[in-house]
């Protein structure tokens, strides 16, 4: 018997990506507070957050298979969250301008008796950005709900010179790796 699949996320991007798999699922947003532990590496932090999100939803739905995910943008060993305002978005984009950074997405798939968590890292390189480029992009309001203040799947694609890794991981869910992991939980497309 196939268990009910739940995506523990309110991210519209993760929903779109999970829809690519053409498997039935429901959405229950996790209400966990996203706090980073300064004693952990970025990879460990993003994995912990993904596990916490999945675990919180699983606690209320013990007969389900739950997917939790989290994405971080890191540069110079520092993780950039979602900007709180336009000034913080501009600061983040200036830091990323003309440089490479890492986008780390962790996925945790959990049932009452099993947990699989994995991380996927993609290197993204930005074009050098002028102050006008930055301000025009901020005007779109696209940076405001995204880690690192950009969305590669939208107008933020114009900022990106190249990527080395999984495009879908940068968007928020490494689709192929997630599907392979779901097969281990007897969920198939």
Swiss-Prot record:
It catalyses: dTTP + H2O = dTMP + diphosphate + H(+); UTP + H2O = UMP + diphosphate + H(+). The active site is at residue 70. Its EC number is 3.6.1.9. One of its GO terms (cellular component) is cytoplasm. It holds the Pfam family Maf. This is dTTP/UTP pyrophosphatase. Keywords: Cytoplasm, Hydrolase, Nucleotide metabolism. The lineage of its organism: Bacteria, Bacillati, Bacillota, Bacilli, Bacillales.
């Amino acid at each position: 018997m196939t268990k009910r699949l739940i995506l523990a996320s309110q991210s519209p991007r993760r929903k779109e990506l999970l829809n690519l798999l053409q498997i039935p699922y429901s959405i229950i947003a996790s209400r966990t507070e996203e706090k980073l532990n300064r004693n952990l590496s970025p990879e460990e932090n993003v994995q912990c957050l993904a596990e916490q999100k999945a675990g919180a939803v699983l606690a209320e739905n013990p007969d389900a298979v739950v997917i939790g995910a989290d994405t971080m943008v890191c540069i110079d060993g520092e993780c950039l969250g979602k900007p709180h305002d336009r000034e913080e978005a501009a600061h983040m984009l200036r830091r990323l301008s003309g440089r490479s950074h890492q986008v780390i997405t962790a996925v945790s798939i959990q049932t009452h008796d099993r947990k699989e968590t994995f991380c996927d890292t993609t290197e993204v390189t930005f074009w050098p950005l002028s102050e006008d480029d930055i301000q025009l992009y901020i005007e779109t309001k696209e940076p405001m709900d995204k880690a690192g203040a950009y969305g590669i799947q939208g107008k933020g694609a114009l900022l990106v010179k190249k990527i080395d890794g999984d495009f879908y991981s940068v968007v928020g869910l490494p689709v192929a790796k997630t599907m392979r992991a779901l097969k281990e939980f007897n969920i198939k497309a």
